[in-house]
Amino acid sequence: MDTIQGELVYCPANEQECRISAKIPISPSEDTGGPCLKVEEDYEEVSLQTGIVPVFIKQDYESSSQDANDLCKPQGDAPASDRKEENLKLSKTVSDAMPALEKFLSNDWKEILLGNSTVGSKDFKGTKESLAEKELQLLLMIHQLTGLRDQLLSAHSEHRNLAAMLFEKQQQQMDLARQQQEQIAKQQQQLIQQQHKINMLQQQIQQVNMPYVMIPAFPSAQTVSAEPQMSLPIQPIPCKPVEYPMPLLHNSHAGRGSASAKHQETSQPLNLTAKPKCPDQFPNSSSSPEFRMSPVGSQCGGTMDSASSSQKANLPLGFLGEGDAITKAIQEACQLLHGQNTSPEHCQQNYRKELLDTLPEKNIQDVTSLHHTEASLLRCSMDIDGSRGNHIKRPMNAFMVWAKDERRKILQAFPDMHNSSISKILGSRWKSMSNGEKQPYYEEQARLSRQHLERYPDYKYKPRPKRTCIVEGKRLRVGEYKALMKNRRQDTRSLGSLQCPPSPSGFSSQSLLGNLSQSPQECNIQVVTSQCLMSHELHGAIHMAKDICSDSEDSVKSDGELVVITD
């Protein structure tokens, strides 16, 4: 058997190496009995692209009768009709297989197969350099792909980390918001508790600062405790002078009453905002005209019978409340004291008549004028105690609200501490406090200022101007003027003490009766000396009242001198 063998190797533009081997055996056909051309084609394709496995295609086909006639000559004695049918079948199979072959082969495959191509076969064979180049390109592409993969993985991890961070931030924000809400709730609870404490302290302050009803001292058999007095509703006491007769209070009982009143004053906490007590609340004080003038009034009154004394014993005690235990106790004490002192008055009535007859009319007029002067001074002092009537106080600031309770605590611990020392301690404590500790007191200040504004919408703060006094042609400050008047009062008192012996500030009925039991001449001498002492004391009281009133009046006269107070 004779064969024709050829090999085709080429590299097309799409970087594919194709190798075609054609082996054409020439053998007689068994069916036809004549020679037949059988073409065996091996096709090898090597792909340079990554991930593509080379594909080997092997196809067997029978060539057409024309190509077979060119390559070999027919042999045998086959009939012509069978040969034509076979040729038709071959042409059909070749025509069906050619489109598939043309996809893998170039246009000049026939020329290359027949050896008519001008290009040498050595140009189409693959070399080692081209293979190394292609391997290098493949390695570079693999390296680039691994780098891209790493970048994608890092970006994915960064995105995942960013999402985790955002989630953590959201959780932190939620925790902060919850903590803030809890802190706000705690602060609100603390504010409510502090407001409750402030309200409780205000109630305690109002209970402590309620005015006390001063009761005259009674004998030990009929003492009245002050506990039921605090439980009862306290009614306002009018500040009007009430005439208390001398027989009501014994000298020893008066001393006890003054001591008890002082003890009550010191035991009470200091109240800077409270008004000074009126003179009628202290019946034992030496400044009230009724007690000081009662001996002379009894001398000038003429006859005094039991009916008039009983009328004086029934004092107007309606302001204490009718049916009150205190009122009943006072009335019983007055009746007891009146019963003890009625018999000596009847015995000494004649001596009083003789004493009044012996006194000159001028002394009686002086005594009455002194009585009116002291009454006017009492009214002036009451006006001063009333803070000039229409004066409106400023609302308390935060420091005053805080210092009110702290001052009370310090006074309870140290009752004898001076007010200036307490103020220094409170000022240093207030400066050392933080803003959070001061906050409730500032809120209380705002509440008080709003309340003050609602109560007095037209209020305007008008501070007192600094004033000076012109005394004997010299301009003096108010403090210097007060010191000068104090020295003058001391001089007048020292002169009075040298001229006449000292006497008690208040006269009792028993001391006067003891003096009247002596001779009438000695009584005259004692009455004159008592009038002298009273005149000196009244002059001192006049100076004190003028000193007190120096801030409110434009001009004050002292010892015949014109004193002008200027701004």
Curated annotation (Swiss-Prot):
PROSITE patterns: HMG_BOX_2
Main location group: nucleus
The keyword Transmembrane helix is assigned to this record: no
Compartments where found: Nucleus
Expression (tissue specificity): Expression is highest in the ovary, with weak expression in other adult tissues.
Keyword set, alphabetical order: DNA-binding, Nucleus, Transcription, Transcription regulation
Any single GO CC term annotated in Swiss-Prot or TrEMBL for this entry: nucleus
Superkingdom of the source species: Eukaryota
DNA-binding region, residues: 392-460
UniProt keyword annotation of Nucleus present: yes
Single GO MF annotation: RNA polymerase II cis-regulatory region sequence-specific DNA binding
InterPro entries attached to this UniProt entry: HMG_box_dom, HMG_box_dom_sf, SOX/SOX-like_TF
Region of interest: Disordered: 66-86, 249-307, 490-513
Biological processes, Gene Ontology terms: cell fate commitment; regulation of transcription by RNA polymerase II
Task performed by this protein: Transcription factor that binds to DNA at the consensus sequence 5'-AACAAT-3'.
Quaternary structure note: Homodimer.
Record protein name field: Transcription factor Sox-13
Species of origin: Xenopus laevis
